[in-house]
Design a protein with these regions (language model features):
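Hydrophobic structural segments
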Residues: 1-192
């Protein structure tokens, strides 16, 4: 029998919760470690639609990237608050939730490595090393196989990431050979 704890332990080997940023909330958000798991649903955010899909498909465990509970809950108001209703429906249907956020972003072979590999970057290095593991951390930096002018680079990003649009600020340098990336909200790191 596979349990919530078994799934959690396996995920933790891939992206240790110790790699999460101090401000983040990761791990078991809701549920019982001892519950049996037969079906898992993976999502970015635990939304009302995701929970409805989980209920309709008899899902035992949802694994999300973004935490179901990020800020401390002050109340569970079922008349007004959609998050409260999500939590109520999860509890009523005995569906557990595990969230792996910045630990998955930072992990070796985590989301930032995946984003770098989608661009076929070479000589990939960690942009901001984690204090506990120099092979892990937020962001990645690497070299393109060959330099691209800005227009071709934007087309390349759109193709590799399957995007319809890309916003760009074009500076004086119009040839791109080195790429730094940081999945998620990396605005705090722009001037680091």
């Amino acid at each position: 029998m596979v349990t919530v704890e078994n799934v959690y332990s396996h995920l933790n080997k891939l992206a240790d919760v110790k790699l999460a940023e101090k401000w983040d909330n990761v791990g078991l958000m809701l549920g019982d470690y001892n519950n049996e798991v037969n079906k898992v649903l993976v999502c970015l955010d635990v939304t009302t639609k995701v929970v409805e899909e989980a209920i309709a498909n008899n899902i035992d465990l949802i694994v999300s990237h973004h935490p179901l509970i990020f800020k401390p809950l002050k109340s569970l108001d079922f008349t007004e608050d959609f998050k409260s209703n999500i939590i109520r429906n999860l509890i009523k249907n005995d569906i557990a939730v595990i969230s792996f956020h910045t630990n998955l972003d930072s992990a070796t072979l985590g989301l930032n490595d995946y984003l770098a590999r989608l661009l076929n970057l070479k000589d990939i290095k960690v942009l901001f090393e984690h204090s506990l593991d120099s092979t892990a951390g937020l962001g990645r930096i690497g070299k393109l196989e060959e330099p691209l002018d800005m227009g071709d680079f934007i087309k390349y990003i759109k193709e590799k990431y399957s995007l319809d649009t890309v916003s760009a600020v074009i500076g004086d340098e119009n040839v791109i050979s080195t790429v730094a990336l940081l999945g998620g909200s990396g605005a705090d790191f722009i001037y680091t």
